[in-house]
From Swiss-Prot:
Tissue spec: Expressed in young tissues with cell divisions, including initiating adventitious roots, primary root tips, flower primordia, intercalary meristems, sub-epidermal regions of young culms and panicles.
GO CC terms, sorted: cytoplasm; cytoskeleton; microtubule; microtubule associated complex; nucleus
Skewed-composition ranges (Basic and acidic residues): 882-898
Domains: entry comment: Composed of an N-terminal domain which is responsible for the motor activity of kinesin (it hydrolyzes ATP and binds microtubule) and a central to C-terminal alpha-helical coiled coil domain that mediates the heavy chain dimerization.
Organism of this sequence: Oryza sativa subsp. japonica
Protein name per Swiss-Prot or TrEMBL: Kinesin-like protein KIN-4A
Gene Ontology biological-process annotations: cellulose microfibril organization; microtubule-based movement; mitotic spindle organization; plant-type cell wall biogenesis; positive regulation of DNA-templated transcription; regulation of cell population proliferation; regulation of gibberellic acid mediated signaling pathway; spindle elongation
Length: 1035
């Protein structure tokens, strides 16, 4: 395989920020990674990084990752360029999901399925021009062993369970292991791996699925399906392009040497994630796998650091490819013959801030790696090209020999042929690129327009020929013209004729409408004339009637005048008028009477109506009264119920208020304690981080001084004290790194506890109406003890503390990352470069031995002290338990004595008996007795502090109530001997009863006690002596 040199290009780096997963949300994790809007820039804490692409979070959507990053690599694969897609990141950051390594048939999630689909789509488009061959291989690196995942024997072994419950894999006996080989041209190959020829996407997906099932996976605390190995899925594409044939002198093509071979590989790498044993909870086999994973990733990080350092690259520094099989296989992808895209998968959770920061740092270094991708051609193609040039040279010489052509002309022809071939190749390549990118010829729209115009012209011709009434005779001048002019004239005449026809039709339509309107107008005019004639006739008839009426009036007037002329008629008229007047007078009188009767009836009707109205009002008032009374009762009952409900609610609110106040104080105290703890831990972390930073800066400056000294005087060497000081400083740095690491772990645990409580409270807040709210680790539910306001206050306080803790974690992660990075730079051989002789090494080794011995002795002494303190603590715990049990027993007996005393003193008619029982019970070992003390009783014997007589010595003593068990033995004996006289004296004085009650009862019952004491003294008399035997205990 030969290679054509290309231009250098940098490794492209894309960052994929996955969202928070369910476990992280339950822990209350916050986003510690922010993406600058509109820019491929990521910020975490005080660090800022710029990459080629950023996906997820507030950056570019993840769906665009393939088109922007991987699709160009697939296109380059058809041009003969190798390509690599590398997924790197912490365990559980989404590498396998992003790559799609574990996809199944029909899935389109991930880079690998989409790459396969794009690859076969392009093959389908070019299969008529190029002959393709596809091969795939799938390997994994498990515990520094290369395993073939496509080998049927390996796949048939499957997974077995070992004693620890972990899944492991067995090797196939008799099968040689896969070996890494390097060809003469520097290409890395795998000897013994299986390469499967595929022709369809389904076959390739089946190979991927088979290898994924055989890959080593396991469950950890951070991921249920964690990849335990580095997986590399390789697609090899071979192309055979047909070139232009070479013609012989006889014009016959040479068929045997007209092909071009290209071979390119696409490596899709899914790395196992870096992990910490404390976070993953791995042990046994899982722990060993994690160690090998971290070792391979460390070697990869060293390779990235060596290639990304421009100074080392210019100096030609050694790149440790051979430190790991992973870096050995990725030698071409990192700094070699490949176009490489690195996808850094990160988690935005604050608990993963340190690992996220380290991933971003490695990805940032990877951007500085320079690759040199070149076109990979088959050696057969080179040989064909060489033979083609030789044939052309021989043909030119033969032509020159036969035709006597001058050699200079032959040379010129050769140059011209080379130039034309080069131009032809460029044109072919351009045509190939245009076809691949779906290029469209800009002349095609114009050709379509011309074709459309020509088709339209043909249609016009056919229409003109079919239109016989509009045929126009052609003149001689037209006949004599060219065919093009004739066609134009015919087209114009046909268009004019069609226009005239359309206009004629429009005019006919207008005439028809006009005639219709005129006929309507005529019809309306004839109707108007008929109406006019009708109303004229009516007017004439009315005039005739008017004249007839006037004539009748005149005739009647004449008759009246003729009647007035007759005298007899006049007398009769007078008589009739007189009679008429009399009748009119009677009518008037009757009308007046009628009017009076009507008026009386109206008044009676009014009075009846008033009475009826009053009766109705009375009934209405009575009904309203009954309703009002009923309403008053209802209102009173409702008010009583309302008042009772309100009082009940008020009591509940008061009780709730007291409970809330208690909860508030309790939460305030809890928040204050947690804030103090958080503040203390934060301050300790800040101090440790600050001290670590100072030590690192001091070591860095001392390292520069030492390097400068060594550079100025190569022969000089450090003194013994300088070496010891330097070693002490390095040990101090390691100790502080360990301290910061411990503080980081404590802060993480505190952060997890706060997050868990916050998640539980938020879930309870959402499900506050549920019957059984979720419980925490201690099994207690806060839903029954926290009110909504208290819960919200607690949530706000926890969110504030979680934010502070998250910021602290991010800052500590940044410092730890820097410390580990510097420690990595000083580790290995770099730490001991300052030693110049064996004597210095021996001296330093002796000093290290002394330091280790002293440390071991101090550890042993501390262990002995811890053991002694544990023993003392055990003894003190035992004593404390015994004391606590005695205290509980004492409190129980004291409570029983108090109940017995209260029962005895409050029983009516049994004052003496009560006093006797109480007094006799006081002789028990744990009963109170009167002994001298510095505290005096508030009240002396007697009623209302009356001075006591007859017993001055006893009343003047200072008394104190103490348990009998705390008295010495001699005191107990003396008290036992004097008890008879003492209690006889108490029973002979009834005033002691009041003093006893005042001592043990409630103060506000003093007046009742005094009255009861006076009544008791008047009714009872003291007995002459006490009974000799001890009475039973009053319970």
């Amino acid at each position: 395989m030969t290679m054509e040199h290309g231009e250098d290009c940098c490794v492209k780096v894309a960052v994929h920020v996955r969202p928070l997963i369910g476990d992280e949300k339950l822990q209350g994790c916050k986003d510690c990674v922010s993406v600058v809007s509109g820019k491929p820039q990521v910020q975490i804490g005080s660090h800022s990084f710029t990459f080629d692409h950023v996906y997820g979070s507030s950056g570019t959507p993840s769906a665009a990752m393939f088109e922007e990053c991987v699709a160009p690599l697939v296109d380059g694969l058809f041009q003969g360029y190798n390509a690599t897609v590398l997924a790197y990141g912490q365990t559980g950051s989404g590498k396998t999901y992003t790559m799609g390594t574990a996809c199944k048939e029909g899935s389109h999630i991930g880079i690998i399925p989409r790459a396969m689909a794009t690859l076969f789509d392009k093959i389908d488009k070019l299969k008529n021009q190029v002959e393709f061959q596809l091969r795939v291989s799938f390997i994994e690196i498990l515990k520094e062993e290369v395993r073939d995942l496509l080998d049927p024997a390996t796949a048939a072994v499957g997974k077995l369970e070992n004693g620890n419950g972990h899944a492991t894999k067995l090797s196939v006996p008799g099968k040689p292991p896969v070996q890494i080989r390097e060809a003469s041209n520097g290409v890395i190959t795998l000897a013994g791996s299986t390469e499967v020829h595929v022709t369809t996407q389904k076959e390739m997906t089946a190979c991927l699925e088979q290898g994924s099932l055989s890959r080593a996976t396991g469950s950890t605390n951070m991921n249920n399906q964690s990849s335990r190995s580095h997986a590399i899925f390789t697609i090899t594409l071979e192309q055979m392009r047909k070139a232009d044939p070479i013609m012989t002198l006889d014009g016959m093509p040479i068929e045997e040497m007209n092909e071009d071979y290209l071979c390119a590989k696409l490596h899709l790498v899914d790395l196992a994630g870096s992990e910490r044993a404390k976070r993953t909870g791995s042990d046994g086999l899982r722990f060993k796998e994690g160690v090998h994973i971290n070792r391979g990733l460390l070697a990869l990080g060293n390779v990235i650091s060596a290639l990304g350092d421009e100074k080392k690259r210019k100096e030609g520094a050694h790149v440790p490819y051979r430190d790991s099989k992973l870096t050995r296989l990725l030698q071409d992808s990192l700094g070699g013959n490949s176009k490489t895209v690195m996808i850094a998968c990160i988690s935005p959770a604050d608990i993963n801030a340190e690992e996220t920061l380290n991933t971003l740092k490695y990805a940032n270094r990877a951007r500085n790696i320079q690759n040199k991708p070149i076109v990979n051609r088959n050696p057969v193609a080179d040989e064909m090209k060489r033979m083609r040039q030789q044939i052309e040279y021989l043909q030119a010489e033969l032509v020159s020999a036969r035709g006597g052509v001058v050699l200079d002309d032959v040379q010129g022809l050769r140059e011209r042929i080379s130039m034309l071939e080069q131009k032809n190749e460029d044109l072919c390549r351009e045509l190939y690129d245009l076809r691949n990118h779906g290029y469209t010829d800009p002349c095609e729209p114009e050709l379509q327009k011309i074709g459309t115009g020509y088709t339209k012209g043909e249609g016009l011709k056919r229409s003109l020929q079919s239109t016989e009434p509009f045929d126009v005779p052609m003149t001689d001048s037209v006949r004599a013209g060219s065919p093009k002019d004739i066609d134009d004239e015919v087209a114009k005449e046909w268009e004019h004729t069609m226009l005239q026809d359309s206009m004629g039709k429009e005019l006919n339509e207008l005439n028809r409408q006009l005639e219709q309107k005129e006929s309507e107008m005529k019809m309306y005019g004839s109707d108007t004339v008929a109406l006019k004639q009708h109303f004229g006739k009516k007017l004439l008839e009315l005039e005739e009637e008017k004249r007839a009426v006037q004539q009748e009036r005149d005739r009647l007037l004449a008759e009246v005048e003729s009647l007035n002329a007759d005298g007899q008629t006049h007398k009769l008229r007078d008589a009739q008028l007189q009679k008429l007047k009399t009748l009119e007078a009677q009518i008037l009188d009757l009308k007046k009477k009628q009017e009076n009767q009507v008026q009386l009836l109206k008044e009676k009707q009014k009075s009846d109506e008033a009475a009826k109205k009053l009766q109705e009002e009375i009934h209405s008032i009575k009904a309203q009264k009954v309703q009002l009374q009923h309403k008053i009762k209802q209102e009173a009952e409702q008010f009583r119920q309302w008042k009772a409900t309100r009082e009940k609610e008020l009591l509940q609110l008061r009780k709730e208020g007291r409970r809330n106040e208690y909860e508030r104080h309790k939460l305030q105290a809890l928040n204050q304690r947690q804030k103090l703890v958080l503040q203390r831990k934060t301050e300790e972390a800040a101090m440790a981080t600050k001290r670590l930073k100072e030590l690192l800066e001091a070591r860095k400056s001392s390292g520069r001084d030492n390097s400068g000294m060594n550079g100025t005087s190569p022969g000089s060497h450090m003194t013994e004290k300088s070496l010891q000081k330097w070693l002490e400083q390095d040990l101090e740095v390691m100790v502080h790194v360990h301290e910061v690491r411990n503080e980081y772990e404590k802060q993480s645990q505190l952060r997890a506890a706060l997050g868990e409580e916050l998640a539980i409270l938020k879930q309870e807040d959402v499900m506050s109406g549920a019957a059984s709210p979720p419980r925490g680790k201690n099994g207690n539910s806060r839903a029954n003890t926290l009110s909504p306001n208290a819960r919200q206050a607690r949530i706000a306080s926890l969110e504030s503390m979680v934010t502070i803790s998250s910021n602290t974690l991010v800052a500590m992660a940044s410092q730890l990352s820097e410390a580990e990075e510097r420690e990595r730079a000083f580790s290995g051989r770099g730490r001991w470069n300052q030693l110049r002789s064996m004597a210095e090494a021996k001296s330093l080794l002796q000093y290290i031995f002394n330091v280790a011995a002293d440390a071991r002795c101090q550890v042993r002494e501390k262990e002995m002290e811890i053991k002694e303190m544990k023993e003392q603590m055990t003894e003190l715990v035992t004593i404390l338990r015994h004391s606590e049990s005695r205290r509980r027993e004492t409190e129980k007996q004291l409570k029983q004595r108090e109940q017995a005393a209260v029962t005895a003193t409050t029983s009516p008619g049994n004052g003496n008996g009560s006093v006797k029982h109480s007094a006799d019970d006081s002789n028990t070992p744990l009963s109170p007795v009167a002994v001298p003390a510095q505290k005096q009783l508030k009240y002396s014997a007697g009623i209302v502090n009356s001075p006591s007589k007859g017993v001055p010595a006893f009343n003047k003593q200072h008394l104190k109530m103490v348990p009998m068990a705390q008295l010495p033995v001699g005191k107990k004996v003396s008290i036992a001997g004097q008890s008879g006289k003492l209690w006889r004296w108490k029973r002979s004085h009834h005033q002691w009863l009041l003093q006893f009650k005042w001592k043990w009862q409630k103060p506000w019952k003093l007046s009742e006690m005094i009255r009861h004491s006076d009544e008791t003294m008047t009714r009872t008399r003291p007995r002459p002596q006490l009974l000799p035997h001890r009475p039973q205990r009053v319970m």
